[in-house]
């Protein structure tokens, strides 16, 4: 059973060091842990390629797809703009798929800040990759119930191996920033205009502006 950890794991638990994360989750019974930021790096490259190929020739703008709440809201309330939502798999799914390609019979538990990931993982197309989803709050309860004290966990191999851009997915605007950096690596001359919003109400307003043509050519993050 593998725990795959969202980039937002950093700073979630008192006395947590990245050299102790693996040992702490193994104390809960997990075989090992992987960082979802690795999947974020893969997602970044895919979205950068899509942006270069699609915008503005085929699509007026492109919106990132990593947040299920944002993606579902956009597709439900603005169906005519649904084609502008990136089709890239989320970092959670990409990370889980990497592990299951090597160990098909293993179980994958995603650990992150957002309960909406439970809904994403319940989709038929994703169930074969992600078996369970736990929030940080739920994992904190497991640490308490198991009596795991971070201070007592021995130092081990550092967990974080993904790029700074991949880990930056946890920060507002971090997804778009990572995609912009990837676009620049592919096409240094390409100028990428970015707009982002926090909270579903602000995301809705942003999509209304996009529908009105205010963000043509933009990379959008919700």
PLM regions and their residue ranges:
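Iron-sulfur-associated redox domains of electron-transfer enzymes in respiratory
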Residues: 1-222
